[in-house]
């Protein structure tokens, strides 16, 4: 399955990396958080870890560690604008439920 990225999300990641002036990609991971247990984490990557998996689409690298991949396999990362708000949207087929505020999820 892997990780997929929409073209809009890829354009946004490229813009962030260009503005930053360095980096080989964006790390997508999970951490323990919120009332449902897990939350998504996005951070810039300058150096790969030996166990990282790299998913490339539209010229953008999404980097995932093996522990997070268990929860993220099959996810699509999108970038959406809804009214005055804009940001990354996670379309994760593994999510069984998420908290009311949308901060965390459970698989």
Swiss-Prot record:
Pfam families in the cross-refs: Fe-S_biosyn
Residues annotated as binding Fe cation: 35, 99, 101
Keywords for the protein's UniProt record, in alphabetical order: Iron, Metal-binding
Organism: Haemophilus influenzae (strain ATCC 51907 / DSM 11121 / KW20 / Rd)
Cofactor names: Fe cation
InterPro entries listed in its UniProt record: Fe-S_cluster_asmbl/transfer (IPR050322), FeS_biogenesis (IPR000361), FeS_cluster_insertion (IPR016092), FeS_cluster_insertion_CS (IPR017870), HesB-like_dom_sf (IPR035903), IscA_proteobacteria (IPR011302)
Name assigned to this protein: Iron-binding protein IscA
Tagged with keyword Metal-binding: yes
């Amino acid at each position: 399955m892997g990780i997929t990225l929409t073209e809009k999300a890829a354009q946004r990641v490229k813009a962030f990396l260009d503005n930053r002036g360095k980096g080989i990609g964006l790390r997508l991971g999970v951490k323990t958080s919120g009332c449902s247990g897990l939350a998504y984490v996005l951070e810039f990557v300058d150096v790969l870890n030996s166990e990282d998996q790299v998913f490339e689409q539209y010229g953008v690298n999404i980097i995932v560690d093996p522990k997070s991949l268990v929860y993220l396999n099959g996810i699509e990362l999108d970038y959406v604008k809804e009214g005055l708000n804009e940001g990354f949207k996670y379309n994760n087929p593994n999510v069984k439920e998420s908290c009311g505020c949308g901060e965390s999820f459970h698989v």
